[in-house]
Amino acid sequence: MNRFLEFSNNFLEVAGNTINNISSKSITDNVGNVWGNITGGRVGQVYDINGRRVTEVKLVAEGGFGFVYLVRDDYNNMYALKRMFIQERERLEAMKNEIDVMQKLRNNPNIVKLEGFKINENRNTRETEVLMLMEYCSGGSVLDIMNARGEFTRLEEREILAIFSDVCNGVLAMHQQQPPIAHRDLKIENVLYCEHSNRYKLCDFGSSTIKTFNTATERGKAEDDINMFTTLFYRAPEMVDLYRGQIIDEKVDVWALGCLLFKMAFYVDPFDGGSLQIINNNYKIPDNSKYSNNFHKLIQFILVADPTQRPSINDLLNYLNEIRGSSRRGLQTFSSNNNNSNNNSNNNSNNNSNNNSVNNSSNSINRPIRTSSSSNSTPNFNSPNTNNNNYNNNNNNSKNYGNTPNSTPPNAKKNIFDILGDDTTSSTSNSNNSPSVSRNNINNNSNNFNNNNNNNNNNNNNNNNNNNNNNNNNTNNNNSNNNNYNNNNNKFDEFESWGNTPLQHPSPSNSNSNVIINNTNSSGKNNQNKSNSGNGNFFDNDFEFEGFVSPTTNGSTNFEVNTTNTNVSLNSSTHSSSSFNNSSNNNNTNNSSVSVGSSINNSGTRLMNNSSGSLPQSRQSSFNSTPQQQQQQFNSSTNSGSYNNLTSSFNNLNISTSSSASISSSGGVSNNSDNSWNVTLTPSQSNKNSTGNLKPLNNNNNNNNNNNNRFANNTNSSRDYSFDFSSPNTSNNNDFGSFVQPSSSSSLNTTHFSKPNYNVNLNQTTSMTNNYNNNNYNNNNNSNNNNNNSKVFDFGIL
């Protein structure tokens, strides 16, 4: 009995001492272990890294030297924590080197970001704990993605090139350091996909070094270092055969990139036979390869046994930039949309500006989770998405091809290789500068395309009282559809197939909902110059205005204008109201306003260019016409027949307060001729009464289409539509020179027009009260205005 009591007292004493020695950290560890046994993982341990407190969420990966955990900070931000226990001094130095490299490359978008680190040395156990807090890449490694795809759904060429491009940019950042840093362990396990940034990133820099080995004198030292820090199947020949006496430097990474590219494509290592196969550079592309010849040539370009002949990382990126083809653009993974763009060459211009609505949603694929020792994340195998980028698309040719093994559908997206350099780089350019490694505006949801080929052979002509000749023979198709883009595209769509057939680049998208004026004509000239000089006179070619003809003796109601002495003023005034965008031919791209006449009063100016301009309300234009009797009204609200002629005639007309014209009318229809224009206002049959005369202009709104385009009819019946028989205004004659020539008398009932200098008051037909930024004035025959509150002029002539 006494022995039992003695044993009990000793037990209680030991237990009490144990309880007193338990620290809070031990309690946390024990609780975490218990909770881990319940949930299947060790969860709950708290770490303090450089003042940042993080808590374990789950175990992500486990390797021979440590573990990778998913952790959460106090602000619910997720990170990857790499925890290692190291006893060898060489391994500890390698970890310190990895931390140093990651700190240098911390801000590179293709390098896994190091958030913090902590090194705890235990002198008693001679073991060192290394903690590295890094950004969490939830997409897993490339190995995880390939395994999840399986044998029969291998990576597509555009996907491989997307991954490869990001990896090359990460390697470029390392090789640009002084001295250059060689990764020396590039493989698919060390490439992670980060879904939040939509990028592939390099990790595991434990093998990286700035050392350069001259194997002739440092053979033994190099051999130990290579065997410890590199993987056999990715080693370059100079690393395998040290007796070659070749220098081992950063070009070993280029060789490893070739092996990585080969394995992503064919799921096998190119040199799985070992050292002898590497030394002989003996690899074979499978006969059943589904990839293009350009892809095979890319592998051959990289895998060069002699390091002195092997390309550098800059050469590799330049080669990628060359073979991509500047006239081909990005692809679409799951849907195809044919987008026609504007190609304005010197001789032919097909203006099919079709902005088609695109909705590309990536397919989600449920795949098993596979972790690797080098991964700091769990894979999420949904196809990565990327949004649109703003760019300038300057192309010469555009073709559309169907789906083939070597091509994939086009997409209204920027090509990924535009990231590598300037977008205007041609397919044959070879820049010595390294391309840009940033992919900007990933979350920008609007695509602004600017398809302008400034290849016009225009003679430099004087705009004042000169006859101008244009060397462009243009054929224009008047098809302009203005729709909205809604893009949600796959990241891999940024790549073309690299096949033997070029792909169509995306069509221009007009994100501005302001005024659209299409300069659509049968044989006009393209005013594409970036300045006001050398554009020629806007009125030197009557075909630019279609129905604008010279004075005639017989014809329908005509605005007859002699443009021989026309003054064209290229004003620099811009306004914050409606914008006149030329979407058909991208003409008048100069940043200046164009108006007829050099004299402008306070009423404002009708502008037409691609800059912002205003259409002021209640403006009066002096047409210098002398009606001898009051004319009946014309109602052009039917939007048909000669009303279309009216709208197309005013495509390029800039009416200022000093514009002038004379009016004559007769029974026939005028023919086109040079140096003048004609506006045919033929009333519809529904607007005539029983006697054949025209009905009064009605005040009802007329629907042009489902978007409820409203005609600018008079809403105030108390105002007069008649001509203003005020004193003749001759001040404008000096502004327009001989802009108006009196036409010979013609008969239509008793109507005669014989002399100028009377004002035509267009106040009632041009008065707009809505917000100009929401208006759309589209003076094109075949224009579909999808913007609300679109207004078309309805001229009531009395």
UniProtKB/Swiss-Prot annotation:
Biased composition (Polar residues): 679-697, 717-769
Region (Disordered) location: 330-538, 553-645, 659-798
EC number annotated for this UniProt entry: 2.7.11.1
Molecular function per GO: ATP binding; protein serine kinase activity; protein serine/threonine kinase activity
InterPro entries: Kinase-like_dom_sf, Prot_kinase_dom, Ser/Thr_kinase_AS
SUPFAM superfamilies for this protein: Protein kinase-like (PK-like)
Catalyzed chemical reaction(s): L-seryl-[protein] + ATP = O-phospho-L-seryl-[protein] + ADP + H(+); L-threonyl-[protein] + ATP = O-phospho-L-threonyl-[protein] + ADP + H(+)
GO CC annotations, alphabetized: cytoplasm
Root EC class: transferase
Annotated Protein kinase domain residues: 54-324
PROSITE patterns in the cross-refs: PROTEIN_KINASE_DOM (PS50011), PROTEIN_KINASE_ST (PS00108)
Binding site for ATP: 60-68, 82
Active site (record annotation): 185 (proton acceptor)
Residue ranges, compositional bias (Low complexity): 335-406, 429-490, 506-538, 557-603, 611-642, 659-678, 698-716, 770-790
Keyword terms: ATP-binding, Kinase, Nucleotide-binding, Serine/threonine-protein kinase, Transferase
Record-stated family: Belongs to the protein kinase superfamily. Ser/Thr protein kinase family.
This protein's name: Probable serine/threonine-protein kinase DDB_G0276461
Organism annotation: Dictyostelium discoideum (Social amoeba)
